[in-house]
């Protein structure tokens, strides 16, 4: 991949590289990226193995506006004509994360949002953790805590369930939760707030980690924002405290601007 990209950036001779992608529906897409001195194209063929035979589902050619191979190993490319509801850019990772970074990403970071609440976009610690509390974050936190999707009861979440999860996951108090997360004393419940999805937001991945003497782990998290063409839009130091029973608590966050402006959360 590096030699193909180097040939492209140096204006070298015609070159191509073939990539195979396994899709969620068990189909396989062959993508051939072709460069010559006048244009870049991607030729694709998608097929699925059924009844002991391969059946072609789709085939075509797309012109590309540009492509980029980052130092960390992301291949990011832009179509010349963006289809309706499509992303500005497409991407995949050429150089994989280490097994430990992938494990830490899945356990502590996967599913957290940079745009739906401010947990990852402001600095906070035990002294001001209540600043990150908003009702809509519970969906994601519950999923990380239980491994299951939340099923609210008639638009409300029982206080015992809500507080058990949030007190386990953050250094906050019941009073702070009830003051900030739409608690209803008559129902002894918290109102369920649906997150309005935002297209193609950045996502975080753990690229390094430090095991601290106090038992906490400081995760170095880079934000990948493909639509901005960046695999290090900003960098977080997210500190967590693992417990012996397998649960954990988020203890603090520090964010640093790198290649892109940090999103500003507004409810």
Give the location of each predicted region.
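Mature, Sec-exported extracytoplasmic domains of Gram-positive
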Residues: 1-267
């Amino acid at each position: 991949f590096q030699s193909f990209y180097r040939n492209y950036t140096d204006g070298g001779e015609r070159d191509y590289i073939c990539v195979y992608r396994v899709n969620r529906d068990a189909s396989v897409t062959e993508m051939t990226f072709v460069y010559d001195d006048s244009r870049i194209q991607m030729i694709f063929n998608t097929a699925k193995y059924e009844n002991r035979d391969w059946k072609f589902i789709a085939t075509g050619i797309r012109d590309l506006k540009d492509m980029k191979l980052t130092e960390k190993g992301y291949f990011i490319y832009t179509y010349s004509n963006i289809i309706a509801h499509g992303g500005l850019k497409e991407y995949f990772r050429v150089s994989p994360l280490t097994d430990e970074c992938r494990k830490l990403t899945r356990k502590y970071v996967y599913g957290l949002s940079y745009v739906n609440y401010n947990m990852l976009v402001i600095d906070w610690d035990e002294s001001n953790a209540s600043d990150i509390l908003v009702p809509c974050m519970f969906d994601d936190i519950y999923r990380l805590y239980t491994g299951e999707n939340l099923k609210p009861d008639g638009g409300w979440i029982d206080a015992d369930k809500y507080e058990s999860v949030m007190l386990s996951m953050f250094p906050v108090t019941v009073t702070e939760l009830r003051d900030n997360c739409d608690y209803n004393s008559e129902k002894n419940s918290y109102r369920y707030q649906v997150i309005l999805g935002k297209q193609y937001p950045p996502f975080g991945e753990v690229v390094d980690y430090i095991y601290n003497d106090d038992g906490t782990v400081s995760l170095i998290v880079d934000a990948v924002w493909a639509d901005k063409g960046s695999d290090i839009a900003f960098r977080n130091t997210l500190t967590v405290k693992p417990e012996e029973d397998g649960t954990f608590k988020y203890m603090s966050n520090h964010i640093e601007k790198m290649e892109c402006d940090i999103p500003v959360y507004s409810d």
